[in-house]
Amino acid sequence: MAYTQTATTSALLDTVRGNNSLVNDLAKRRLYDTAVEEFNARDRRPKVNFSKVISEEQTLIATRAYPEFQITFYNTQNAVHSLAGGLRSLELEYLMMQIPYGSLTYDIGGNFASHLFKGRAYVHCCMPNLDVRDIMRHEGQKDSIELYLSRLERGGKTVPNFQKEAFDRYAEIPEDAVCHNTFQTMRHQPMQQSGRVYAIALHSIYDIPADEFGAALLRKNVHTCYAAFHFSENLLLEDSYVNLDEINACFSRDGDKLTFSFASESTLNYCHSYSNILKYVCKTYFPASNREVYMKEFLVTRVNTWFCKFSRIDTFLLYKGVAHKSVDSEQFYTAMEDAWHYKKTLAMCNSERILLEDSSSVNYWFPKMRDMVIVPLFDISLETSKRTRKEVLVSKDFVFTVLNHIRTYQAKALTYANVLSFVESIRSRVIINGVTARSEWDVDKSLLQSLSMTFYLHTKLAVLKDDLLISKFSLGSKTVCQHVWDEISLAFGNAFPSVKERLLNRKLIRVAGDALEIRVPDLYVTFHDRLVTEYKASVDMPALDIRKKMEETEVMYNALSELSVLRESDKFDVDVFSQMCQSLEVDPMTAAKVIVAVMSNESGLTLTFERPTEANVALALQDQEKASEGALVVTSREVEEPSMKGSMARGELQLAGLAGDHPESSYSKNEEIESLEQFHMATADSLIRKQMSSIVYTGPIKVQQMKNFIDSLVASLSAAVSNLVKILKDTAAIDLETRQKFGVLDVASRKWLIKPTAKSHAWGVVETHARKYHVALLEYDEQGVVTCDDWRRVAVSSESVVYSDMAKLRTLRRLLRNGEPHVSSAKVVLVDGVPGCGKTKEILSRVNFDEDLILVPGKQAAEMIRRRANSSGIIVATKDNVKTVDSFMMNFGKSTRCQFKRLFIDEGLMLHTGCVNFLVAMSLCEIAYVYGDTQQIPYINRVSGFPYPAHFAKLEVDEVETRRTTLRCPADVTHYLNRRYEGFVMSTSSVKKSVSQEMVGGAAVINPISKPLHGKILTFTQSDKEALLSRGYSDVHTVHEVQGETYSDVSLVRLTPTPVSIIAGDSPHVLVALSRHTCSLKYYTVVMDPLVSIIRDLEKLSSYLLDMYKVDAGTQXQLQIDSVFKGSNLFVAAPKTGDISDMQFYYDKCLPGNSTMMNNFDAVTMRLTDISLNVKDCILDMSKSVAAPKDQIKPLIPMVRTAAEMPRQTGLLENLVAMIKRNFNAPELSGIIDIENTASLVVDKFFDSYLLKEKRKPNKNVSLFSRESLNRWLEKQEQVTIGQLADFDFVDLPAVDQYRHMYKAQPKQKLDTSIQTEYPALQTIVYHSKKINAIFGPLFSELTRQLLDSVDSSRFLFFTRKTPAQIEDFFGDLDSHVPMDVLELDISKYDKSQNEFHCAVEYEIWRRLGFEDFLGEVWKQGHRKTTLKDYTAGIKTCIWYQRKSGDVTTFIGNTVIIAACLASMLPMEKIIKGAFCGDDSLLYFPKGCEFPDVQHSANLMWNFEAKLFKKQYGYFCGRYVIHHDRGCIVYYDPLKLISKLGAKHIKDWEHLEEFRRSLCDVAVSLNNCAYYTQLDDAVWEVHKTAPPGSFVYKSLVKYLSDKVLFRSLFIDGSSC
């Protein structure tokens, strides 16, 4: 028995140890069967092919997220956002798995090609073309189908059976498979479909309003809809940028605009409504009718994608029941129905109840937010005292662990330092017995200091509050208030007074005598509360600030927002304003509104000076000087008070301007001027305004405009009389131009001293023998002017200003009521039309001459309208219903008709706005139509010194109508009009190109014999007009005179070589000049000017582009695409056309002769021939003069011939030549400079120009050199570099003044023809050892990070680790309609020109950013006198300063030096945008800024050989920056790209493929051909021989996008 037991035990132990073979075989068999069953089950899963190239980590993400599928990863297709694109296929299949096979399904916004390939003939795809991107995607799906069918046809195969039904359906009835209507408006009618209907929405519900979704589903009889969309919980915080790390995408939020994009990609962004998406997330029920709703239920969240389903619910199926007492009661049935309806209403209307009122539901659907709270963090600027606030998500357990612990501290121990120490200790890792224990809470370490301050302040206030409750304000000799302040004083030390003031200001503490009240603010907001608040804010859409009011600075913020509308609000002194409000106890918002009302002329009070300064206001209110005797006064009421102040005191003001400078005490009471004859022999002084006084206008804006118009007539009259008086006083000194406008009659001799060009002048100025001057009404007899005995001379003017102004003044004076103009109640409609839109034609078609009135500015226009209206032979237009404005006002009341039904004013915007208001009132019309052009020549105030405020120039209207189709202008002019007008301007003209220009040798060349001018002759100035008339040309007018006219052909002439202000790119005169012709315009000019540039640009426009502006009728269908492209680049895919010869032709045109250079053996020739070199002090090891032989690998041979050279071999001679041409060739241009003081001033300018004001001082609490910074630096290094540091103990530094020297084997190609005459030097690299870089690398990395965080990124771009898309975003908000100067600073020998001054500037910048003094001194000495050693070439030398091209600060150092250089020379406070990168810079300034002599300053101060270029387009880091009216696009330099295709260093085909991919990455923007025309202009600006290059851009796209085709650009060198 004992043996049996022993044997059994032994056998059992053998089995356990695995020594029993029988048991082992059974276990293996069982394991095998289990594995087979598992693999068979896996094989039965749906199979999905994943062709996109993704990483192993992304492969694991996809596999774990979708275990329902058997995914095969092929990694055969490179694509943008590969993971997201591949996951989209998995998401589609997952949604289709939820639907019974064969049931009718609507795919909202789906991919119909995917369903065809899967053989789903029961799916209808609703694919609306909401934007151009949708059209492109749909065309791509069609292409994929055609590609699939062509492959089958090429292989002799047919469509598989499982696909045949779907493909037959698509071929026969395509609208049954796919439509392009929105889901809400889709009208698809299924054919004999039974069973339930389903729908899926894959990333498409964003664009369907949530309020319309339920009804749209019901209209299609959908039973269940399955949807998927992207979302992130962090969108509910105050962050404007949220990352989706798993798919490398991001959300950015701006108000209600939510933008989704993929990081590091140039694909188009997707814009949605944030409030709409929030409704889909938060709402549970989506009403479809008064009976049915769709209930939403979340299914699962996978890889940043949320899945949910919407189920159709019939609310009539709800249980009907109610408690009752009497069965027979009639109220029973009513109560039952009411209760049931109430129950149904709750289900349909309280749609947010389930999610918003149940916090557990929130925690379930937002698992990351469970037990998380939102804690506010605060910061304050020491300079400006401005407070900033942000929010972070922190574990609730962590918050209360800290609060509960620090609440136990004694009063002396409760300090900020102790709180921070405790918070850091519970967050840090702990090492126990050599094992690292991770902290329970993963809180970002960068937040610990701010969190500690929040915890500390909250606890401190809570402790004080508890003490107050206990003590009840009685603690012996000291009051509780005194005890509290003592406690706070101990905590804060010397900072106590400011802390006390801060607590009082924030109203966290209030003091009233000895009583003290403390309010402890809420510490946090839960995620559930934030979700509820965000959702309700999006539904109700109020202007709600959901932040806790923990500071009263919110009021000040709103006040400053109110003030931000003012011009130059950035210069507003916020501190002074704040102190004023505090000291006077004034509400900041009230004060801000008053300031804005006065300074923006919205207070009903207009000050005609520029700014309401103290001096100007005092001048407006001061007493006036005494008037001279004999003054003629135009007044309409009695005046009692002797001054303007008196009038203001009693609440009324005299009509401005009628009295000039004269005081009211000199007015004649009740003196009225009944007729113009009363002006006869009035003293000239009474009409001449010697000085324009500070006038105050009151009343509504229309009244103020009308008063200003009366003043303008007075000013015009006084100016005309003054000019005639001046001529009489000095007749001999009149120039030729003035003589043509005036005449002077000598009364004694009856001769004209200056003969006037016209005759029978109605008015003149008379000089008497007593040297008195009077205005006189002239009469004529047989001998001429009738004169008086005491007259000496008479001056007349060919202009009728005196007579017309007097007549209009007389009329307007009669219209005044108690000195105030009357404003009509008629409706005023502004018809804003482009040139040639048919404004006159429209007036004639709408007018009824029996009851309407037409007013025009000039006689010619009035005659033209009468002629066109009476062309049928029936006289309908007469001088009674078609008048000039002057005639109507001068003869008002003399016509038989005084009232009109409608008033039409042609070219009304050329009139003074007050004049228009008077015309409307005088016509007594019911409605007035003012036809004009807001971009053409407006009313011009021609009286120098007369104030015409800017807000007076805007006509007050009730309605605005636009006309944007021109019947006159050809297509090229229409292209120009689109730059000037909002909205799309179209043309009905069949003429495409009509403008041309000709530069003439001088003004003398223009004469009728040698240069006959075709068509209508126009000029810009009166002097040019008179010159042409004097030379024999006829019918010549100025541009201003012919506004509104139309001519077949126009010759525009400029004879004035000096600058003319009205000839500018944005000038209305240029617009009028370009838009007068219907067939042709030719511009003859003696100088280059902006109009020449405009015409040259229009001449280069392609015909297909001009076809876009062609319209056959007046409908403007193109207006519909405005919303598609607004604020983003238009994308037009570039056709893939062209050949290698296109690239070669383009290169040869741009750089003629470069491709013929045979430079393959230049390096060999230099080594073999004698050479003479001038060398500075250096040591040469001649044993290294002969390089060691190496095996030569024959590279691939390029088919494109460029100036590229073969890689050179390392050697003493090659390295020495490079060192001589670079390190030994530094310029010496600088003058005598006080280095330290000048460097300090330059750095002051640098910080003031580029850094945000609140970040100009370093954060001394942050350590620059730490373990974290070293680890960050090590992560960027290669393994070889880290290996070099294995024996470095970081105790002592190697010699910091010792550098190694080497060079790049591949010479740099220059985009010029210098290769034809010189041997290019190689680029040298001077670098430290890795041990020194390990010290300074992390240090400068942290300093660089601080610098870039402090830069004003809205205006300045320091190009470090930026993508082309980020460059486009930075320059994207440039307004192309605003005239700008684009500046580039070109510096040669930039690195080697830097001397002691540059070193001092850079050191001062780093020092102010927090660079430690000892290491700073070490770094400075390491860049002063330095030793260079080239062990390969055997060269050793010494250089002073210079930029080391391999130093840790090479790139950022060069960047800050170029920025500091420009800040010291240019007015950076005026800059619009600025970008800096190494030695490259690009600046955008407002047009017309004055710049100093940059070359002189750069030479003397900076030792730079510099040139400042002004360009139309920027060139930055090898890329052209093309700004346009919708944003900005960055094109890689196509010539540089072609130059790289001639590379002779490509080793093999694998190296070639890597080369192609790198070129594809930088040249991706060339795929967009929408802005090729602007790119042509930009290239031509640099290379004047460059032809239009769209053909070569398309060729580059073709070859770069096809790796097989790209191989044809090279041939194998080993086979040659």
Curated annotation (Swiss-Prot):
- (+)RNA virus helicase ATP-binding domain residues are 801-963
Residues in Alphavirus-like MT domain copies: 72-281
Q: Where is this region: Methyltransferase?
A: 50-458
The protein's annotated catalytic reaction(s) are: RNA(n) + a ribonucleoside 5'-triphosphate = RNA(n+1) + diphosphate; ATP + H2O = ADP + phosphate + H(+)
Q: Does the keyword Cytoplasm apply?
A: no
- Which residues take part in binding ATP? G833, V834, P835, G836, C837, G838, K839, T840
Q: Which UniProt keywords apply?
A: ATP-binding, Helicase, Host-virus interaction, Hydrolase, Inhibition of host innate immune response by virus, Nucleotide-binding, Nucleotidyltransferase, RNA suppression of termination, RNA-directed RNA polymerase, Suppressor of RNA silencing, Transferase, Viral immunoevasion, Viral RNA replication
For this protein, what is the EC number?
Answer: 2.1.1.-, 2.7.7.-, 2.7.7.48, 3.6.4.13
Q: Does the keyword Nucleotide-binding apply?
A: yes
Q: Which Pfam families match?
A: RdRP_2 (PF00978), ToMV_Hel_N (PF20896), Viral_helicase1 (PF01443), Vmethyltransf (PF01660)
- Can you tell which superkingdom this protein's organism belongs to? Viruses
**InterPro entries referenced in this protein's UniProt entry, alphabetically:** (+)RNA_virus_helicase_core_dom (IPR027351), Alphavirus-like_MT_dom (IPR002588), DNA/RNA_pol_sf (IPR043502), P-loop_NTPase (IPR027417), RNA-dep_RNA_pol_alsuvir (IPR001788), RNA-dir_pol_PSvirus (IPR007094), ToMV_Hel_N (IPR049329), Virgaviridae_RdRp (IPR047310)
Gene3D superfamilies in the cross-refs: 3.30.450.420, P-loop containing nucleotide triphosphate hydrolases
Effect on the protein of changing C349A: Loss of RNA silencing suppression activity
Region of interest (Helicase), ranges: 830-1085
MF terms (GO), sorted A to Z: ATP binding; ATP hydrolysis activity; mRNA methyltransferase activity; RNA binding; RNA helicase activity; RNA-directed RNA polymerase activity
Which parts of the sequence belong to the (+)RNA virus helicase C-terminal domain? Answer: 964-1116
Query: Where do the RdRp catalytic domain residues begin and end?
Result: 1380-1493
Q: Name one GO biological process term.
A: mRNA modification
Q: Look up the further comments and give them.
A: This protein is translated as a fusion protein by episodic readthrough of a termination codon. When readthrough of the amber terminator codon TAG occurs between the codons for Gln-1116 and Gln-1118, this results in the addition of the RdRp region to the replicase.
The Swiss-Prot or TrEMBL record describes its family as follows:
Belongs to the ssRNA positive-strand viruses RNA-directed RNA polymerase family.
Assembly and interactions? Heterodimer of a large and a small subunit. Interacts, via its helicase region, with the Nicotiana tabacum arginine decarboxylase 1A (ADC1A) C-terminal internal region.
Kindly provide the name given to this protein in its UniProt entry.
Answer: Replicase large subunit
| Taxonomic placement | Viruses, Riboviria, Orthornavirae, Kitrinoviricota, Alsuviricetes
